[in-house]
Swiss-Prot record:
Matches recorded under Pfam families: PHD20L1_u1 (PF16660), Tudor_2 (PF18104)
Compartmental location: Nucleus
Keyword Repeat: yes
InterPro entries, alphabetized: Agenet_dom_plant, KDM4-like_Tudor, PHF20-like, Tudor, Tudor_PHF20L1
Entry-linked Gene3D superfamilies: 2.30.30.140
Protein name: PHD finger protein 20-like protein 1
Function according to Swiss-Prot or TrEMBL: Is a negative regulator of proteasomal degradation of methylated proteins. Involved in the maintainance of pluripotency of embryonic stem cells.
Protein's UniProt keywords contain Repeat: yes
Protein origin, superkingdom: Eukaryota
Domain Tudor: 11-71, 85-141
Region (Disordered): 178-231, 289-359, 383-411, 536-559, 613-651
Length: 762
C-alpha cells in the first residue's frame, strides 16, 4: 500500500532533490535523494562528496532530514521585518561599499529595477540593491552635520541646497586632489606641512606641472565667478601660491643652469684630455691629418671657455697637444705604454704629480727627453698640466722632425754612448730612469755582433718586452756598477762586456739583481751562470772549439768565448763521458758554481742512458745463447782474478789517498753529483778490460782505446781544466794514483751491476 510523503517546508520529495542529512557521527552533510520507497516511506540518501557505500535509507518523516537553504529563510524573515521601511530620494542612509562596510550616503534616485542610486559623502555614485542599504540612526545624522562644519571645503549638500552646488563642489574637490597628486608627495604628518610646501615650490617645475597648474588656475577663476560656489573655496590657497612659486622657480632655474654649464665644461675638459691621449696613441698616417687639425682648433678654444688662464700656459698646452698628435706611431707605441706605468708609480711614491714631469739634467739626447715629456704631459689631466707646465718654449713640429732625423743619424753613425752619459743616466728622477735605460739597451743591440746569439729589437717584440718599467727604481744600481766595469777594461773586450750588460739588464728587470764580485773574472763567470736562458740568448755548455792546454782560462778572465752545441754521440761516447765525469768530479770538486750548472745535465744524461741501455740489453740478451754467456762470464772472472793479483799491493799503498778523496767529496753538491755519475757508470753494457794507457784519462770500457787528443777535444772537460795561475801547481802523482783508484772502484761496481742485471734477465 503506497503512502504519500509528508508536507515539509523546504524539502521536495523527488529523486535528485537536495537536502541536508545527519549521518551516524551526528554531522550534517549536504545530500541528494537517490531512490524513494513509497510503500515503506523511506528514501535512499547519498551524501555528497562521499562514496556510495555510505548511502543510507532514511524515513522521510525522520528528524535526520532538514531543508538545505535555511539562510535564505532567515534573509526572507529580515526582509519581512524591514518591508515597512521605505526610502525616499535625498534621504541619508548607510550604504554598503566594496569592502563590505557601510558608510553614510545619500539616495539620489530610485530605479524601476528595484535598485537605488546612492552618492557617498566623498562624491562616488553607485547603484545598490535594497539589501545593501540600511537606514541611518538619528545620532549618526547629527555627526554628519558636525563634519560639515569641520571641513567646509567638503561640505555636504542637504535637501535645502540645490543639486548643482553639490556637483560643482565634487568637481572642485576632484581637481584639488588631482593637483595634489601631480605636484606634491603624500603628506606623512600635519606638522611638516609648511616645510614640505616650501620644498615643493623650491623645486623647478617641469612642463607638465606648469600646464597642470595653469589649467587648475583657469578652473578656479571660472568657479569664483559663479555666485553659488564662491564660498566653498575658503580653505584652498590655490590662487596665491603658484604666483610666488614661479618667481622663485625662475631664480632656481638660472642657478641650476649655471651649475649644469660648469659641470658640462668640466666633463668636456676631461673628455678632451682623454681624446688627446688616445689620438696620440692611435694616430694613423692616412686619417691622422684631419683629426690632428680638429684637435688643434678645439683644444685651445675649449680651454679658453672653461677657465681664464695666462696666455703662456694656453700656448704651451696648444703646443703640447699639437706636437703629441704629430708624433709617429712607431715611437709612440713604445713610449706611451711605458709612460702610463711610470706616471702611476710616480704618483704612488712621491705623492704629488709635479714630480713626474721634471726634466732630467743629463746631457743625453735632449730630443729624446722632450719626446718623453710630451707623451707624459698629453696623458695627464689638464689640472696637472696647469700646475706643472713651466713657461719654457717648446720646439715646433718642423724642429721636432729635424731632431728626429738628427737622432737617427747619430744612432747609425756612432751606435754608442759615452761612459759619462751612462753614469749620468742613473741620476735623474724616477720617471725617466726606465726609459733611458731602455734606450741604452737599444743602442747596445747595434754594437753586439756575437755569432751564436740572436738579438731581437725591443720594438719588434711588442708586448713581451724584457724591461719591466714598473720596477724602474731597481735599475739604477746595476747601471752604475756596469759602467764602472766598462771603464776598467780596454776596448778589445767591448763585445763581451756589452753582452753581459745587456743580459744583466734582463736579470735586473726580472727581479734578479746580478751580484758583482770583487775580481773581474768571477764577475763574468757569475753572470754567465746566473742569467736566465731565453729563446734569443742561450749560453753554450762549454767554451770554444780550440784545443787548449790546462792554462786556457787566463788570470784576467775577461775572454768569454761561445762554442757550437755538442753533437750527439753514439753509445760508446756515452761510456767515455761516464769515465770523464767521474775523473772531473775528483779534479774540480772545489769549483761549486760549475758543479751547480752541470749537476742537472749529468742527471738527465744518466736517466736517458738508463732507458737506452736497458732496451738494448734486452735485445742483445735475446740474441745471445746461454753457452756464449757462460763462456763470457768465465772469461770475465779470470780477467778479474788476474788483475786483482797483479794490483793487490797498490790498494794498501793508496788507502790514505782514497780516504782523503772520500772526505773531500762529502759535500752535498759533490755527493749528489757523484751518485748520479756512479749510476751512469753502472748502466753501461759490456764488461771492461782494464788497461793502463799512457795518458791520464784514456781508460777503455768497450775495447776501444782513447787517445789524448780525443779526450782533450771534448768541450765539457776542457772548460773545467784549471789554470796554473790559480793553483800554482800541476797535478802530482798522488792525485793521479787516487784517480786510478777511483776508476777501478767504479769499474768493479759496474761489473757487479751488469752481472746482476743478466741474472735478473735470465
Amino acid at each position: 500500500m503506497s503512502k504519500k510523503p509528508p508536507n515539509r517546508p523546504g524539502i521536495t520529495f523527488e529523486i535528485g532533490a537536495r537536502l541536508e542529512a545527519l549521518d551516524y557521527l551526528q554531522k550534517w552533510y549536504p545530500s541528494r535523494i537517490e531512490k524513494i520507497d513509497y510503500e515503506e516511506g523511506k528514501m535512499l540518501v547519498h551524501f555528497e562528496r562521499w562514496s556510495h557505500r555510505y548511502d543510507e535509507w532514511i524515513y522521510w518523516d525522520s528528524n535526520r532530514l532538514r531543508p538545505l537553504e535555511r539562510p535564505a529563510l532567515r534573509k526572507e524573515g529580515l526582509k519581512d521585518d524591514e518591508e515597512f521601511v521605505d526610502f525616499k530620494p535625498g534621504e541619508e542612509v548607510l550604504a554598503r561599499w566594496t569592502d563590505c562596510r557601510y558608510y553614510p550616503a545619500k539616495i539620489e534616485a530610485i530605479n524601476k529595477e528595484g535598485t537605488f542610486t546612492v552618492q557617498f559623502y566623498d562624491g562616488v555614485i553607485r547603484c545598490l540593491k535594497r539589501m545593501h542599504i540600511k537606514s541611518m540612526p538619528e545620532d549618526a545624522k547629527g555627526q554628519a552635520r558636525e563634519r560639515e562644519q569641520i571641513a567646509p571645503e567638503l561640505r555636504l549638500v542637504t535637501e535645502v541646497e540645490p543639486k548643482e552646488d553639490w556637483i560643482a563642489l565634487v568637481k572642485a574637490a576632484a581637481a584639488a586632489a588631482a593637483k595634489n597628486k601631480a605636484g606634491t608627495k603624500p603628506r606623512t604628518s600635519a606638522n611638516s606641512n609648511k616645510d614640505k610646501e616650501e620644498r615643493k615650490w623650491l623645486k623647478v617645475p617641469s612642463k607638465k606641472e606648469e600646464t597642470s597648474t595653469s589649467t587648475i588656475m583657469q578652473e578656479v577663476q571660472k568657479k569664483e565667478e559663479e555666485p553659488t560656489s564662491s564660498d566653498t573655496f575658503v580653505g584652498f590657497p590655490i590662487v596665491d601660491v603658484p604666483k610666488m612659486a614661479f618667481v622663485q622657480a625662475e631664480s632656481t632655474l638660472s642657478h641650476k643652469r649655471k651649475s649644469n654649464l660648469g659641470n658640462s665644461f668640466q666633463a668636456k675638459r676631461a673628455r678632451l684630455n682623454k681624446i688627446t691621449g688616445l689620438l696620440a696613441s692611435k694616430a694613423v698616417v692616412a686619417d691622422g691629418a684631419e683629426k690632428k687639425e680638429g684637435n688643434k682648433e678645439t683644444a685651445p678654444v675649449l680651454e679658453q671657455e672653461i677657465s681664464p688662464k695666462p696666455q703662456i700656459q694656453k700656448k704651451n698646452e696648444a703646443d703640447i697637444s699639437s706636437s703629441a698628435n704629430i708624433q709617429k706611431p712607431a715611437l709612440l707605441s713604445s713610449t706611451l705604454s711605458s709612460g702610463k706605468a711610470r706616471s702611476k708609480k710616480c704618483k704612488q711614491e712621491s705623492g704629488d704629480s709635479s714630480g713626474c714631469i721634471k726634466p732630467p739634467k743629463s746631457p743625453l739626447c735632449p730630443e729624446l727627453i722632450q719626446v718623453e715629456d710630451l707623451t707624459l704631459v698629453s696623458q695627464l689631466p689638464s689640472s696637472v698640466i696647469n700646475k706643472t707646465s713651466p713657461s719654457q718654449p717648446l720646439n715646433s713640429p718642423r724642429s721636432y722632425k729635424h731632431s728626429q732625423r738628427r737622432r737617427r743619424s747619430q744612432r747609425l753613425a756612432t751606435c754608442s754612448l759615452p761612459d759619462d752619459s751612462v753614469e749620468k743616466v742613473s741620476s735623474p728622477s724616477s720617471v725617466t730612469d726606465g726609459k733611458v735605460f731602455s734606450i741604452s739597451a737599444q743602442n747596445q743591440q747595434s754594437k753586439l755582433e756575437v755569432p751564436d746569439v740572436a738579438h731581437m729589437s725591443l720594438e719588434k717584440r711588442g708586448p713581451c718586452l724584457p724591461l719591466d718599467l714598473s720596477r724602474s727604481s731597481e735599475v739604477t744600481a746595476p747601471l752604475s756598477t756596469e759602467s764602472t766595469f766598462r771603464n776598467e777594461y780596454p776596448s778589445k773586450d767591448k763585445e763581451d762586456i756589452q753582452m753581459i750588460t745587456y743580459l744583466s739588464s734582463k736579470a735586473v728587470t726580472d727581479g734578479r739583481v746580478a751580484t758583482t764580485a770583487s775580481a773581474p773574472s768571477s764577475h763574468v763567470h757569475a753572470l754567465h751562470l746566473e742569467l736566465p736562458l731565453t729563446n734569443s740568448l742561450k749560453l753554450p755548455k762549454g767554451s770554444s772549439k780550440k784545443k787548449r792546454s790546462s792554462t786556457s782560462v787566463s788570470s784576467e778572465g775577461t775572454e768569454i768565448q761561445y762554442s757550437v752545441p755538442v753533437k750527439e754521440k753514439c753509445f760508446e761516447s756515452l761510456k767515455e763521458k761516464i769515465l770523464k765525469n767521474v775523473i772531473e768530479k775528483d779534479k774540480h770538486s772545489e769549483v761549486g758554481a760549475v758543479r751547480v750548472e752541470r749537476k742537472g745535465k749529468v742527471e738527465e744524461k744518466s736517466s736517458t742512458t738508463y732507458d737506452f741501455l736497458s732496451g738494448k740489453k734486452k735485445e742483445k740478451e735475446k740474441e745471445k745463447k746461454e753457452k756464449k754467456e757462460k763462456d763470457h762470464k768465465s772469461k770475465q772472472k779470470k780477467k778479474k782474478k788476474k788483475k786483482k793479483k797483479s794490483k793487490q799491493h797498490d790498494y794498501s799503498d793508496y788507502e790514505d789517498s782514497s780516504v782523503e778523496f772520500l772526505d773531500r767529496c762529502s759535500s752535498p753538491l759533490t755527493r749528489s753529483s757523484g751518485s748520479s755519475l756512479t749510476l751512469r757508470s753502472m748502466f753501461s753494457e759490456k764488461n771492461t778490460s782494464y788497461q793502463y794507457p799512457r795518458a791520464i784519462l784514456s781508460v777503455d770500457l768497450s775495447g776501444e782505446n782513447l787517445s789524448d787528443m780525443e779526450f782533450l777535444d771534448d768541450s765539457s772537460t776542457e772548460s773545467l781544466l784549471l789554470s796554473g795561475d790559480e793553483y800554482n801547481q800541476d797535478f802530482d802523482s798522488t792525485i793521479l794514483k787516487s784517480l786510478r783508484m777511483k776508476t777501478m772502484l767504479s769499474m768493479k761496481l759496474l761489473d757487479a751491476f751488469v752481472n746482476w742485471m743478466k741474472k735478473m734477465a735470465l
